[in-house]
Amino acid sequence: MNRLYPHPIIAREGWPIIGGGLALSLLVSMCCGWWSLPFWVFTVFALQFFRDPAREIPQNPEAVLSPVDGRIVVVECARDPYRDVDALKISIFMNVFNVHSQKSPADCTVTKVVYNKGKFVNADLDKASTENERNAVLATTASGREITFVQVAGLVARRILCYTQAGAKLSRGERYGFIRFGSRVDMYLPVDAQAQVVIGDKVTGVSTVLARLPLTAPQIESEPESEPALQTAPVETAANPSAEQRQIEAAAAKIQAAVQDVLKD
């Protein structure tokens, strides 16, 4: 059970809307009969939109869970704009029929929350990640890995709700936010994370594993030390080459003289 939200069936953000729709539908039914049908349709739609069912949560410590229901629209290597590092980016688009409650993808500690004002273009488009209103949660997992998950407003969604803050500890599957009426969530994971989904896959919040993230970062191999240069033994040369040459010439002269003496005899 989520410690921040003990009623998992209907999201608390929908209680005023559902309650108002139900009261209005009953009132119109008593006064106008069948003319109340549109009000009942709206109330039923609100019930399904704000549903927030409990889900089974995988406990593999390497599993990064989908924070929301939806469809995968991006799986690529990209730049995490909040940490300025290369990352594996996975984006999930939510239509109005998906559960819009956002939950933590891993056991983590929130290090920073960054809110950016922006536009409200279709959240299915890539430019929504950089142009739309968005709220980023930067966190460090229990094993020390850094991840970023971003709530992105959509064409209809006009309000991002985030209930966490720097220093807060989130358990995997714990509810931390909500976006109304169609939106998107961008995930930025370390580059050594292994994606478990592809574009077009439909995912279920906290039940689908988006990626597997090793508990420790890969070790950067250091360059091998260069071998010391072999020292060449110095070549000894004659201390006085001219004197040696004179000795050779003198010996040659003696030999020549001896040969001449032999020939004379």
Swiss-Prot record:
Q: A GO CC term?
A: plasma membrane
Q: Pfam family of this protein, just one?
A: PS_Dcarbxylase
Q: Where is this region: Disordered?
A: 220-243
**Origin species:** Neisseria meningitidis serogroup C / serotype 2a (strain ATCC 700532 / DSM 15464 / FAM18)
Q: What is this protein called?
A: Phosphatidylserine decarboxylase proenzyme
Residue list for modification Pyruvic acid (Ser): 183
Give the lineage: Bacteria, Pseudomonadati, Pseudomonadota, Betaproteobacteria, Neisseriales
The UniProt entry's sequence similarity note says: Belongs to the phosphatidylserine decarboxylase family. PSD-A subfamily.
What EC number(s) is this enzyme filed under?
4.1.1.65
Q: Which reaction does it catalyse?
A: a 1,2-diacyl-sn-glycero-3-phospho-L-serine + H(+) = a 1,2-diacyl-sn-glycero-3-phosphoethanolamine + CO2
HAMAP family this protein is in? PS_decarb_PSD_A
